[in-house]
Amino acid sequence: MSLTLILIRHAKSDWADPGQPDHARPLAPRGRRDAPRMGAWLARGGHLPELVLCSDAARTRETLALMQPEWPTTPEIRHAPALYAAPPRKLRGALEGMGARSIALVAHNPGIGQLAADLAAEAPAHPRFADYPTCAVTVLKFEAKDWSSISKGHVAAFAIPADL
């Protein structure tokens, strides 16, 4: 069975209020511009999730809220506190037991970028894949019976807002 994993780092966040808790930081104007563009890019490529697992931080929720209207279908959305600042192991663990064949994870660096690198059978030639900038998106394809049995996957697509 073919499984698709879409790894999305939140869009550029706002650092204007130094006293604001990290969890509550909203998107910066650039992030609010980039997120819909990346959502449209996913839709044009036919990379649409059935399920979205999203960190409950303000900037990940806002990124998803701006991407999702660009998609022709509405996925099930679950906001998960455990995905906030999660390491790759925890992000990957969130997939286990999920029945959806196409899942998007919306999370934070360094975890989301490390997970993309860990799961890619071959990293894309893109010069920004290694540092996984804000609003970077990787689409990985796996031939596996379920999420607990995925190993290395094929990178079907990778982009950052500057590419569009």
Language-model features, listed with the residues they occupy:
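Short, cationic low-complexity segments
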Residues: 160-164
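Generic beta-sheet signal
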Residues: 5, 100-107
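Short phosphate-binding loop-to-helix
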Residues: 82-99
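Active-site-proximal alpha-helix that buttresses catalytic centers in soluble enzyme cores
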Residues: 2-82, 124, 132-133
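Glycine-rich phosphate-binding loop signature in dinucleotide/nucleotide-binding domains
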Residues: 45-47, 97-101
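Short glycine-/acidic-enriched loop or helix-start segments at secondary-structure transitions
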Residues: 17, 63-64, 89, 114-117
